[in-house]
From Swiss-Prot:
Protein name: Stromal interaction molecule homolog
GO aspect biological process, one term: intracellular calcium ion homeostasis
Recorded coiled-coil stretches: 310-407, 420-462
Residues noted as binding Ca(2+) in the record, renumbered to the chain: 155, 157, 159, 161, 166
Effect ascribed to mutating residue 166 to A/Q: Increases Ca(2+) influx through activation of CRAC channels and arrests cell growth
Gene name linked to the record: Stim
Organism: Drosophila melanogaster
Signal sequence interval, chain numbering: 1-23
Spans traversing the lipid bilayer: 295-312
Length: 570
């Protein structure tokens, strides 16, 4: 501010002297002064280093004032030599006009000084095209010089302005933008200003968001946009803010190399280009790195979720396989128990048939006893007598029991009950066959599933398919069918045991379903009568034995079915 004041005073006084000289003489002296003034201003414009040599004191300004006064006095003396009265009159007029002009100039300078201080203008009394004066009045002189250097770098035709084609060439050639730079170029040419001067570029830089960046924002830009995070600590150490980016943009060797200590030329060039971009065209554009990071994170999360889902499905499949294996083992045990029980039932039935056959043979032999020849041995006669005695005793006991009960079943009831038992046995056999088929199909499905699980593709398909659920459901259905067959067989044994106990008839041991159908529906009276007679005669003799056999069979069957039920429920 003090330098501006000195130069204002000097220029005003110099103008006053020129005006005074012009009033005295309009000859060659005026042309000489004007040419000297033009040469001085032209020298200031051509030599930008003059701005750095303007650190003069108030005494240098005063000496310049004295030298100019002596020059004016010398001119007045030269004119005074031309003679007498006219010289005295000119000297008085010169003294009076110089004093008036000097007073007016001083008052105008003071008013301009106060007006420039009040308005806060950055360039004060500098001319619009006087960059040296303008850079000398700003605080960030290095930043201003860097902005001017960038302006010269963009101004290809050296006309003092940056037009649209020059900025377009700079974006394409220097910053290597192939596309997507229209917004940044539009932001550079603010308000469609197609000709940008140094002053406008400096004012745009002062308004820029990048100019107000803090140290943290600058280091973030260095790490993310420039991708040189190794210099973050160095920037923090030297407190590099956004205002220092123009010096980085012009690749100031003193600042970048000596102050910051960055020696790698490739890194210097990279920092310079990125700094040019943000200084001239604003904050860096989105390069898509963040979106790539989002997509990468999303894909990573999807992969993790997919792996977790596959792991869960594999674990569930293994758990289903273990459960199916357990169910199959339970079904196998139930099947074995059922087969053993069926074998025991068949064995008991064969024993009952053998007993009945022996009884019939004994009765036949008793009937044929009178016709035996006397040649039979005494031993056989004794045995027959013993058997006859036993039969008589049992017959008498049965008659006694019938007399005590005072009720005897009808003759045909035994045949109908035997026929009913055979029908139930036939239906039970059908259900058992169906349950065995379900068991066999479940076993085959389980084997197929195990074969599929042996390969990777089959394991993936079986994991994501419905085959496991279908096999599991078929196993459960087979187990339920076996349970129903077991319960029904247990209930039948108990029920027919109670019926035989109450009636004293042999129902379980019979001559078979075809014979019973022939007897009951064939209308053969002889067979029916003989069946009735044999039943009345033999029933009393077989009541005790059949009851005891049914007791043993029911107890054994009950134990077997209890074991089978426990295996089936497992």
């Amino acid at each position: 501010m003090r330098k501006n004041t000195i130069w204002n005073y000097s220029l005003i006084f110099f103008c006053c002297v020129l005006k005074s000289i012009s009033t005295l003489d309009h000859g060659p002296h005026t042309v000489s002064v004007d040419s000297n003034r033009h040469n001085t201003q032209h020298q200031y414009k051509q030599n930008p280093n003059v701005a750095s040599q303007r650190h003069s004191s108030h005494e240098s300004g005063q000496s310049l004032h004295n030298s100019q006064s002596e020059h004016v006095t010398h001119i007045a003396a030269s004119h005074a030599g031309s003679g007498g009265e006219h010289s005295t009159h000119l000297a008085q007029n010169l003294h009076r006009s110089s004093y008036n002009l000097l007073s007016e100039a001083m008052s105008q300078a003071v008013s301009n000084e106060f007006s420039s201080m009040g308005s806060g203008s950055a360039d004060g009394a500098c001319a619009a095209d006087d960059f040296d004066c303008y850079s000398g009045s700003v605080q960030d002189r290095f930043g201003m010089e860097a902005i001017a250097s960038l302006h010269r770098q963009l101004d290809d035709d050296d006309n003092g302005n940056i037009d649209l084609s020059e900025s377009d060439d700079f974006l394409r050639e220097e910053l290597k933008y192939d596309s997507g730079y229209e917004k940044r170029q539009k932001a550079f040419h603010f308000n469609d200003d197609m000709h940008i001067s140094v002053k406008e570029l400096w004012e745009a830089w002062l308004r820029s968001e990048v100019h107000n960046w803090t140290i943290e924002q600058t280091t973030d830009w260095l790490a993310q946009s420039v991708q040189l995070p190794q210099y973050v600590d160095l920037f923090k150490l030297h407190k590099v803010t956004g205002a220092a980016l123009p010096r980085l943009a012009v690749n100031n060797l003193q600042y970048v190399g000596n102050v910051l200590g960055i020696k790698d030329p490739i890194h210097k060039q990279k920092i310079s280009l990125k700094a040019m971009d943000v200084v001239l065209f604003g904050p860096p554009r989105e390069t898509g790195t963040r979106w790539k990071d989002y997509i990468l994170v999303t894909l990573l999360l999807s992969a993790i979720i997919g792996c977790w889902y596959a792991y869960q499905q594999n674990k569930n499949a293994k758990r289903h396989l273990r459960r199916m294996a357990q169910d199959m083992e339970g079904l196998q045990r139930a099947e074995q128990s059922l087969q053993e029980m069926q074998k025991e039932l068949e064995r008991a039935r064969m024993e009952q048939e053998n007993v009945a056959t022996e009884k019939l043979d004994l009765e036949r032999r008793l009937k044929e006893a009178p016709t035996l020849s006397s040649s039979n041995s005494d031993l056989e006669v004794q045995q027959l007598k013993k058997e006859i005695e036993m039969l008589r005793n049992e017959l008498s006991r049965a008659e006694f029991e019938l007399v005590d009960n005072c009720w005897s079943p009808p003759p045909q009831l035994q045949s109908w009950l035997q026929y009913t038992y055979e029908l139930e046995s036939k239906n039970h056999q059908k259900k058992r066959t169906s349950a065995e088929k379900q068991l066999q199909s479940a076993r085959e499905a389980c084997e197929k599933l195990r074969k599929k699980r042996s390969s990777l593709v089959g394991a993936f398909v079986s994991t994501h398919g419905k085959s496991i659920d279908d096999v599991d459901r078929s196993i459960v259905e087979a187990r339920n069918a076996l349970g129903d067959v077991t319960n029904e067989l247990q209930e039948r044994l108990h029920r027919w045991k109670q019926i035989e106990t109450c009636l004293g008839l042999n129902i379980v041991n019979n001559n078979g379903l075809p014979y019973l159908e022939n007897v009951l529906y064939g209308r053969n009276g002889g067979l029916q009568s003989s069946m009735g007679m044999s039943s009345t005669k033999g029933s009393r003799a077989r009541i005790t034995n059949s009851t005891e056999d049914l007791d043993d069979e029911s107890i054994q069957g009950k134990l077997n079915f209890e074991n089978f039920s426990l295996l089936a429920t497992e």
